[in-house]
Amino acid sequence: MKKLICMILAMVMALSLVACGDKEEKVVSTDGSTSMQKVINALGEAFMEETGATFTYNATGSGTGIKAVKDGTCDIGLSSRYLKDEEKAEGLQETILAIDGIAIIVHTDNTVADLTIEQIASIFTGEVTNWSEVGGNDGEIVCMGREESSGTRDGFESITGTEDACVYRQELTSNGAVLTADSENPNAIGYDSQSSVKDTVKAISVGGVAPSEATIKDGSYAVQRPFVLVTKEGVALSETAQEFFNFATASAANEIISAAGVVPVN
């Protein structure tokens, strides 16, 4: 009898181990753009609440997120710029989630309220070096920007035609760092995701148009870029990652996306 009981217990334990092995943990990992932090966290929280899955976001910057997808170290990459032709040639594919404005930000005490694209380009390339040259008070302009792999920097320089020509006092690794730097220097100017801007800085108009959801949506605000989900062609997402992808790109998620300060495309 004792031997029989031991055999039954062994069988029960074996079956339990099989059952545990068959149960896949529901996890989706994302990596990339710091500009997308607000919207991706909002989507992730809603997804976890609805499904009970675990959602992770690693804020490393667009370039690193794109590389993570290519290397297979995350499920979905996050980019605040379009994929380049060479990245698409490597089998990466983009799905546009939303459109975000790139706000041109200055210190709250700065009297300049509006600049043209041409003036912005002249400032960041060092042709214009004093605020008095663009209608402001006398003071040397201090340009703050993002690091080279940043999607925000790529979008800003592409739109202003300043690729490889900007003269930065500091190249910072996150949007939050740019906000802080601009808020602490009365002569600073920088750029940041419109959805990330706080009242510690002033977002100026560009060509007479202020950045807002309405002006980004109708295209009248010129400095804007996409928020992109990056996946790898021919590589199936896990069941949970695909579930999140479908959740984030469905029209039902538009309210969440809009509440995060960006314009949904679906």
Which ranges hold each PLM region?
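C-terminal motif of bacterial Sec signal peptides marking the signal peptidase cleavage site
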Residues: 16-19
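Exported/periplasmic ABC-transporter solute-binding proteins
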Residues: 4, 21-266
